[in-house]
Amino acid sequence: VPPDEPEPEASVLQGATEGNGIDIVLMGDAFSVQEINDGTYESVMEDVMDYFFDVEPFRSYRHLFNVHMVTIASEQSGYAEGIDTPLQCRYGDGNSITGSDASAFRYARLAVPEERMDEVLVIAVLNSDTFGGTCYMYPPDKGDSANGISVAYIPAVDMKIHLCGLVQHEACGHG
């Protein structure tokens, strides 16, 4: 983290009201300190959370989820050639997005204890209006292959219908 940027920090957007909760960790990439300070970052993360729970069966089971937000500042807003971001997100072929899954999981550990990380869904929101999206899933070493950690990369596209669809497709559908 450059000296003029705040350290990444975790907060809770929603706590499960029943059981231990299923953990989702939201984080952004290429959001500036100004966008964090003016509330843009948190507003985008809250929108993503609401879109996640806007479809069944997630709507009916919302009370079973813990939703965490990890706030990460980038040197600048958005993406430009030659600029590194905390999650190292990049657009690939077609609509694919890559990033540093290891970095995403490292930041997620600020919000979720290590013993709960094996089934976390990370939703990494790119500060970009370029359409795309990809989810990477990692099965656990043991047990049910339907379990495991995953990270969904989704751009914060301007149009609500597109962002909502991306969240539901990548995070709800694949994650």
Placement of each model-derived feature along the sequence:
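Active-site scaffold of zinc-dependent metalloenzymes
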Residues: G94-R109, A124-I161
